[in-house]
Amino acid sequence: MTTKRVNTATNKIMTLNTFLDTCFLLFISILFYLSIPIYPNKVVVVPQGSLKKVFFSLKDQGVDINALDLLLLRLMGMPKKGYIDMGDGALRKGDFLVRLIKAKVAYKSVTLIPGETRYFFTQILSETYQLETSDLNQAYESIAPRLNSAVIEDGVIWPDTYHLPLGEDAFKIMQTLIGQSMKKHEALSKQWLGYYHKEEWFEKIILASIVQKEAANIEEMPLIASVIFNRLKKGMPLQMDGALNYQEFSHAKVTKERIKTDNTPYNTYKFKGLPKNPVGSVSLEAIRAVVFPKKTNFLYFVKMPDKKHAFSATYKEHLKNINLSNNHF
């Protein structure tokens, strides 16, 4: 009887040892498996949907993933949706699975330079974030501020470098860009004017956008602004080429034919006053030039051979400067 009890106890111990050995071997095997290097793309796309859908999507992207990984993910948790940054080079399989669940969403940077138009910036956004320009334009028009019930076509998005997550839709991208930009507009207006009034502020942005397009450098900006104010005060048409560099014409040379045929409010040769919308994005310096313009009696300016402008108070002086300019070009 005693021998039988001893044998039973021995069998239980042996069974337990076998079980523990098996668990240990399984543990070591999993550790070894999780340490195997894989070479995923720098950015992988995790779709919305079931874990099975995620699994097959990763396989389609060339990720070395199998049924065991699917089982491990079921135990670890649901991967994040979106574009996941996996970094550069090799990753251990375990690190890859953890990044699927906990890693930061991948970002890309995009820059709007002062003077550029929304037309071209939208194309850059489209190429960078793989979005349709039509969707981006529709999103902009639904979010952007309005003047007299009409969307402000340009000059709203602040020129800057933006770091935006991949995988966001057009509405979210525009919501971020316009939201951040409007905070800057309001803050700057309150800093320089002591208050923010949308209509008054964006009239200054319209002025600044022409200054931005016309000035050869930052130093000229207050002088260009003074010419604009002086001509407006006298009821003179602005007659500025830069106002015609709107939207898709941002980089187009303004010709006599263009001045003759363009019938939009941007044509300050045909229409007195300011255009209804900013011509493009504006820098801090251009806005400052409009808020704090230089006091001059200048009414004219012309580009000289050194690419800078010669300013004059009378048409007679202006003609002399034009002759000097023509003789050197």
What spans do the regions from the language model cover?
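Hydrophobic membrane-insertion alpha-helices, especially the h-region
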Residues: 17-34
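Signal peptide-directed extracytoplasmic domains
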Residues: 27, 36-187
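N-terminal Lys/Arg-rich, disordered targeting/topogenic segments
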Residues: 1-14
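Bacterial extracytoplasmic/cell-wall-associated proteins, especially those involved in peptidoglycan
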Residues: 127-131, 144-329
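Hydrophobic, aromatic-rich alpha-helical transmembrane segments
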Residues: 14-18, 318
